[in-house]
UniProtKB/Swiss-Prot annotation:
Protein name: UPF0282 protein Tneu_0934
Organism for this UniProt entry: Pyrobaculum neutrophilum (strain DSM 2338 / JCM 9278 / NBRC 100436 / V24Sta) (Thermoproteus neutrophilus)
Regions annotated as coiled coil: none
Protein family per UniProt: Belongs to the UPF0282 family.
Positions of transmembrane segments: none
Xref: Gene3D superfamilies: Ribonuclease Z/Hydroxyacylglutathione hydrolase-like
Amino acid sequence: MDFSPVGEESLGVRSMCFYVETRDVRILFDAGVSLAPRRFGLPPHPRELERARAVRAEILRLAEAADVVTVSHYHRDHFTPWYPSVYMATDGEMYKRVYGGKRVLLKSPQDLNWSQRRRHYGLSKALREAGAEAVYADGGEWAFGGTRVAASPPLWHGPAGSKTGRVLGFAVSDGEERLVFLPDVEGPLEPEPIAFARGARPTVVVVGGPPTYLGWDLEKAVKNLAELVELRPHTLVLAHHLLRDVQWREKVAPLFELAERRGVVVATYASLAGRPEELLEARRRELYAEEPAAVAEAGEGEEED
């Protein structure tokens, strides 16, 4: 199994896009990218806009090769929209290149809030127009030659009862490596993502970590991350909300200590790519101070998640 990070906060954008290739199938997880319309009272810096365009170009390149594309849920950083968006770096036609002719494993409309149900409706229509094979993936399993792909039951996007609803995780096994992809579980804060990972016996776990800026129970999140370490994957990739904080390492320091004792490598998308971390959103104030730019208003339709 080969895998590569595509876009994520350590690479300068909001995303968890990740590419996995086995002997049998090529999967592009959550082919989306977006930027926070406002952070610290500021819109995206030109450096962020430039990076979003670069990530979008890489998504398009990898989508051309992919057999399967996933949509774990309908937040803007996890899918490619059917409408133009500066902050999602798309012209309103790129979704056809991402999804056209692909099998798309997507979250069902159950357990979604109103805004996500609305996006589900729009994306479902766009997928039909693009000639995609759309499959509601919740709890499903598929075989591609010697590769097995499983989707989790719906998992909470954050704490149980969260207004942001639920998401899907995925597990891929090719008989050698076993990779688990847990987007936007925000910790995890609940036991279900851990149970799904445990059942997959992962060698690699990619997990959306806790948002330190939302007031969630960070101690609980670190404890649950420790349970993922105890599964003894060779690599644990921390991603997404956690890396919207420049001090994220200090805030999960006990996890690094445990991982070192267990022989587990704690990685980021940037380290997997052999690149330095560029937490552009978390450094937005500094970017405007270091590289002054005109502060533009958010474009029409550009909203948080």
